């Protein structure tokens, strides 16, 4: 046993002695050879290609890489090799190169135009604690440093218009500033946290002290401050603090560009009326979208003679003989009427879709009887729909109505392509379902819905969609017909007593009297003399 152990020890010693005799291959970096076992310090200029060769020097303890320009790669290598003391230099400009262990830095002598480039190099100085910038004419340099390293102590003297600027001031007068002054101040505003009031004096909307776009930038830079400016716009005296702006029936010729710029600077604005201003719908929509906290109202046109304001809650346009036939080509503007609750577009046989209903989330009553509508998909976005007269149309799919869980009254008579009412099975609020005798719903489905909705009256016998109890429920004592509860509410909501077929026609607009030639039956001359009215007055083929 002892003899075997002795043999093992002798064999191990032989192997060690054999290894000691092997030659160590040097590491060559830029023509200089380094012993990987004994090299602990190096001084060299490296590139991104040669820097990885330092990994082949496992005994390395210190590396002076001053003069090297691949700073991102050097910084990453140093972080990956914390056991090596890495030294390098950072060129801030041609005549200013500092070591990476710099703690304090004075950049006051750097030309202002070169300062931004110098600041970009500071992240390569991990030991840096304080920086002196000297006199600054704008705050961009200080902002850059604050964003790069919030813990860095930065000293500077802010100047504006040749004078030292007090960043702690609470009030500022800009009534006499130039565009250049405003641009320079813009960079300082985020640092003026105590600023509370900024006055721009008074003047016109067309010639403010600074451009409206610039003013909007300044307001965004100092949101805690109130900017004041009294100005005249289209003959109206206004201020930036106004909460309402009424421009209705004022002809505006720039598609609302000036109004859009001004209202963006009115943070308290909650109501803007631009009825009959001649601005196209798409431009008005841009103004509306630019003011999320403000109700923006304008006039839209649809059909060939219908019109209404976008804040209208009820629209009645069921007289093609006056307002023209409604069709997919001339009803698009209705999408801007996002507050509509009550909508009657019946008797329009060319009406083929309801795309505009996608934008009517508050819709409660809908009448599209005697139309060509076949797709109810937009109604899936109308969860508050209560009353729907869909009879005598081209329906073939009721699935979108499954989302209308508040639906109480539904008339689907005279829809010859409709064969499935299963989407209605979950409408537990439904109290009246008029199918009539001509809509081909399977008997089994009729019996099933009666079972599922025992409180719902289901009519499958009447030929006339509006006969019997759908609209009239007996007579009053004086012999007058008594409307059913659902229809009576519809009449109230739609204000049928005001106009039985249409009050969306142009001649019924009450605004014509104060702004026209003295009566409500003729549009004012300035409207009739417009070069172009963007509406198709031809009847669809």
At which residue positions do the language-model features occur?
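C-terminal motif of bacterial Sec signal peptides marking the signal peptidase cleavage site
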Residues: 16-19
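Bacterial lipoprotein signal-peptidase II cleavage site
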Residues: 21-26
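Histidine-anchored nucleotide/phosphate-binding helix
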Residues: 54, 122, 189
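Concave beta-strand-loop units of leucine-rich repeat
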Residues: 38-50, 59-72, 81-95, 100-121, ...
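Short, solvent-exposed mixed-charge patches
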Residues: 539-541
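Positively charged n-region of N-terminal signal peptides that target proteins for export
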Residues: 1-5, 10
């Amino acid at each position: 046993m002892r003899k075997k152990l002795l043999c093992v020890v002798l064999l191990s010693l032989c192997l060690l002695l054999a290894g000691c005799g092997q030659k160590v291959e040097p590491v060559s970096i830029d023509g200089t050879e380094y012993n990987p076992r004994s090299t602990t310090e190096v001084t060299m200029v490296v590139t991104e290609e040669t820097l990885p060769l330092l990994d082949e020097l496992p005994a390395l303890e210190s590396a002076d890489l001053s003069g090297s320009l691949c700073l991102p790669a050097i910084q990453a290598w140093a972080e990956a090799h914390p056991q090596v003391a890495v030294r390098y230099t950072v060129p801030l400009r041609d005549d200013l190169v500092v070591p990476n262990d710099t703690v304090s830095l004075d950049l006051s002598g750097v030309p202002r135009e070169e300062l931004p480039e110098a600041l970009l190099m500071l992240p390569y100085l991990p030991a840096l604690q304080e920086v002196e910038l000297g006199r600054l004419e704008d705050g961009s340099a200080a902002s850059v440093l604050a964003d790069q390293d919030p813990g860095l102590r930065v000293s500077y003297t802010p100047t504006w218009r040749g004078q030292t600027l007090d960043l702690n001031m609470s009030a500022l007068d800009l009534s006499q500033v130039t565009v250049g002054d405003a641009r320079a101040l813009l960079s300082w505003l985020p640092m003026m946290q105590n600023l509370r009031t900024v006055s721009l004096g008074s003047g016109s909307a067309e010639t403010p002290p600074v451009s409206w776009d610039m003013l909007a930038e300044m307001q965004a830079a100092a949101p805690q401050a109130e900017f004041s400016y009294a100005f005249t716009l289209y003959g109206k005296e206004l201020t930036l603090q106004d909460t309402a702006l009424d421009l209705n029936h004022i002809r505006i010729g720039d598609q609302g560009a000036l109004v859009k710029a001004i209202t963006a600077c009115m943070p308290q604005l909650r109501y803007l009326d631009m009825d009959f201003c001649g601005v196209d719908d798409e431009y008005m929509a841009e103004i509306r979208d630019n003011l999320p906290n403000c109700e923006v109202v304008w006039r839209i046109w649809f059909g060939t003679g219908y019109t209404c304001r976008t804040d209208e809650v009820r629209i009645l346009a069921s007289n093609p003989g006056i307002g023209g036939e409604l069709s997919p080509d001339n009803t698009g503007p209705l999408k801007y009427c996002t507050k509509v609750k009550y909508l009657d577009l019946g008797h329009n046989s060319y009406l083929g879709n309801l795309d505009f209903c996608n934008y009517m989330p508050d819709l409660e009553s809908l009448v599209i009887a005697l139309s060509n509508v076949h797709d109810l998909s937009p109604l899936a976005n109308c969860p508050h729909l209560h009353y729907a007269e869909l009879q005598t149309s081209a329906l073939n799919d009721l699935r979108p109505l499954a989302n209308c869980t508040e639906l109480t009254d539904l008339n689907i008579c005279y829809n010859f392509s409709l064969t499935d009412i299963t989407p209605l099975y979950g409408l537990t609020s439904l109290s009246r379902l008029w199918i009539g005798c001509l809509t081909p719903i399977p008997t089994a489905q009729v019996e099933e819905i009666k079972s599922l909705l025992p409180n719902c009256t289901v009519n499958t016998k009447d030929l006339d969609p509006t006969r019997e109890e759908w609209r009239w429920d007996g007579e009053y004592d004086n012999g007058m017909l008594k409307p059913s509860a659902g229809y009576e509410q519809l009449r109230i909501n739609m204000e049928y007593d005001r106009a039985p077929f249409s009050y969306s026609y142009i001649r019924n607009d009450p605004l014509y009297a104060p702004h026209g030639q003295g009566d409500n039956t003729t549009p004012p001359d300035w409207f009739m003399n417009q070069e172009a009215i963007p509406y198709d007055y031809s009847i669809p083929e």
